[in-house]
Amino acid sequence: MNLQWQKYPENASKLFKLTVPIFISQLSASGMGLADIVMAGLVSDDDVSAIAVSNSIYFPLFLFVLGVLNAITPTVSYLNGANQRNLIAHQIRQGFWLVWAFVIPLIVVFLNSHWILDYMNTPAVFAQKSQDYLAIMAIGIVPALLTVNLRCMNDGLANPKPAMRITFIGLLCNIPLNYIFIFGKFGVPEMGAVGCGVATAIVNWSMFLMMFHYCYTNKPQKDIGLFNKWFEMPSGKTLLKICKLGLPIGFATFTEVMLFSTSALFLSPLGSQVVASHQTALQTSSMLFMVPLSFGIATTIVLGRVLGQKLVEEAKIISYHALITGVIFAVIAAILIVLFNNIIPLAFTRDPVSIAIASHLLLFAAVYQIPDSLQVVANGILRGYKHTKPVLYVTVFCYWGIGIPFGYVLARTDWIVQPMAAAGFWLIFCVSLSLASGLLIYQIRKIQKIPAATLIAKLERIK
């Protein structure tokens, strides 16, 4: 197809204006996790491992619900582009019902995490810390998801700056709170890894109150009328539409995260050094992943608005410009990892064995930067088109059909080669992400071949 390079600067500018605040917001959120790992590492590798194993349970479930709620963003963006802002408040109110529907079972899981930890043969030396950490995180998940719902509205309105400011403030608060609760300052008992959970719960509640205050007082959003009603009965029709779009996103997010998170659980019997080095490489890769992830979210917002304006050909051009820009970011990230793979682990641990393992794993992380960037931007494009079911099918096949079983085989068994430990999972990460990126781009090409009138009619039915 004609990529219309003369439009690239204009389209890149649209995307960058949204990407920068989204990136800062994502980076701040990821920075909280990084601060937890780094500060817990000053206590012991056992505390780092406790957080790593806890996060392998917490984040897949949290991100599943986040994925479902993310269906609200392209819907709001589409309604905003179609000049139907009066329909937006209803979507957000129904989003609150979804939050409560999911949050109660999540709390039950977190309060009974010992069943999962026992099943995975997690070493007793940090299993109890993981249980206590998750019990505290159960307190903070309610405000975290309520904040996501309000953030999705602002993102859909192409207004990501409030979330950027609030999340950055959350990061600034998280670090001193970690210091107080991890090391036991100002009369607070020393909690180690569990202190990270206490700090995170406090920060989550604070961020929700700030986001609520912004949405309540922001004059440009008054016409939406979100707070004209303080209570609205659940609408089966609207909730079904959100779930039809959001559940595939949620399950796709869950399957991808599980590819990474279950690796920590399967590696935990190999000891603290292996888990800590694996977590070091994973945390570094996750920080760099924030750029294409933010770009993918920005692409969803722009495409939703453009499709709401019925500009189907313009949406095609923006899609491919976004993919190309994602590759550029990935190449830069890969080069940085290769150049500094021996230095990066020093920020996480002082153990020489953990440093050596992490340095090796980071080279695998460099390899998969391009396919990982392509798949996340492609995900954003398909969400903008509200074409989410194929994303689920691709991710389940690539990450659960290939990634998890073959990662386990390479890491823990001698069925194919001698056990590769963490490197076995990282090799499969590269394979799974490469396959997923190719299949998702194929899905983009497929939906863009649909006649414009047919595509718009489909989008109107599910708005």
Swiss-Prot record:
**InterPro entries for the chain:** MATE_fam, MATE_MdtK, MdtK-like
Q: Which UniProt keywords apply?
A: Antiport, Cell inner membrane, Cell membrane, Ion transport, Membrane, Transmembrane, Transmembrane helix, Transport
Give the UniProt subcellular location, in the record's own words: Cell inner membrane
Offer one Pfam family short name for this entry: MatE
For this chain, one GO molecular function annotation is: xenobiotic transmembrane transporter activity
Q: How does it sit in the membrane?
A: Multi-pass membrane protein
Any one annotated GO CC term = plasma membrane
**Record GO biological process:** monoatomic ion transport
Residue ranges annotated as transmembrane are: 20-42, 57-79, 96-118, 133-150, 162-184, 194-216, 245-267, 287-306, 318-340, 355-377, 390-412, 422-444
Q: Which domain of life is it from?
A: Bacteria
What is the role of this chain? Multidrug efflux pump.
Record family assignment: Belongs to the multi antimicrobial extrusion (MATE) (TC 2.A.66.1) family.
Q: What is this protein called?
A: Probable multidrug resistance protein NorM
UniProt source species: Haemophilus ducreyi (strain 35000HP / ATCC 700724)
